[in-house]
């Protein structure tokens, strides 16, 4: 089995068993941009499982670092209304997220 096949099987397990995606269900996938290959596989498998729509939210630690270093102090605790509404709207959806920081030291030197 090659790496691509292994990734697809892992994604299928996460979608069908972990998230238990059902026919017609909306799915919300989130993770770091470095995990794009896995997120794409999760998206494919969610559609194969019958998802009606898959939304992907990529996060970028370099953008977060810029906010911490350069942005106003208020940005650290600010949560826009549209983000709160998104959380409420997607609460009943199947959710899949990737974890694991590919650059664990990126934010280490920040206070």
Regions found by a protein language model. Give the residues of each.
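Active-site bordering "gate/hinge" segments
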Residues: 1-111
């Amino acid at each position: 089995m090659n790496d691509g096949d292994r990734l697809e099987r892992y994604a299928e397990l996460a979608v069908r068993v972990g998230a238990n995606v059902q026919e017609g269900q909306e799915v919300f996938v989130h993770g770091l941009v470095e995990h794009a290959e896995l997120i794409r596989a999760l998206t494919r498998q969610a559609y194969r499982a019958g998802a009606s729509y898959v939304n992907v939210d990529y996060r970028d630690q370099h953008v977060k670092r810029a906010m911490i270093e350069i942005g106003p102090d208020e940005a650290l605790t600010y949560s826009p209304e549209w983000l709160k509404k998104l959380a409420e709207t997607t609460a009943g959806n199947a959710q899949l997220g990737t974890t694991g920081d590919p650059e664990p030291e990126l934010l280490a030197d920040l206070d």
